[in-house]
Amino acid sequence: MNFAFYMLMPTMPVYLVEELGISTSEVGMVLSSYTIGLLCVRPFSGYLVDCFSRKPLYVFAFTIFACLFAGYWFAMTVYTIMAVRFIQGGFMGLTSVSGNTITIDVIPSKRRGEGMGFYGLTINLAMSLAPLVAVGLYDRHGFFWIIGVALVIALVGIGSVGLIRYPKREKVPRPAFSLDRFILVKALPAALAYLLVAIPYGMLLSFVVLYGKEIEVPDPGYFFIFMAIVVVTARLISGRLVDHGKIHV
């Protein structure tokens, strides 16, 4: 899922500017529509995960998310691309929350730090390697090839969900619908800290390839190679440090 998504993140701005002639301000609107869709769904995702069977919900959201990649083949204006990204962002929010919850459920509690470290590693690897693959595909075959490859990868990801041995959960009463189910006040400081880190990172990842082409860097993909090396090293070390009490969270 993440690999498919991050293939579009650095290459879509280049496609919009070079092939559709869209201004950089409009590019920002297109990119932000995805985040807006995600934010509209995220507050309700936890409630849905608690109310319904998690694995079927995960498969449903993942399937819609994957199929929406095909929408980019037909979206040729700013507003149609924004619409596809908005809807896909919403299903990305539901897919990520249900996937994270399932991951926590299946990891043994004694190895949760290490397990989540490896889970996070796969996400970070996708963030680092998918743009590298996408840049190579874009230079050789164009943006529509990226869409096709991303769609296939996402569909393979759906198939791999069947390999997850998810324990049966006892039926519990559905939680009452209330505002505090969607906003966890205690989590706001951590959310703010992550937001302050994610904003500059998202800006960098979205426009680094476009900037590299503007200053005529021969291969902007090297940026992602070095980032992948650092991410893998940090993730492999940090999970074990948390489990052994060396890092307190």
Where are these predicted regions, by residue range?
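Helix-loop boundary and gating motifs at the non-cytosolic
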Residues: 1-20, 25-28, 199-211, 223
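Cytoplasmic helix-loop-helix junction between adjacent transmembrane helices
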Residues: 84-121
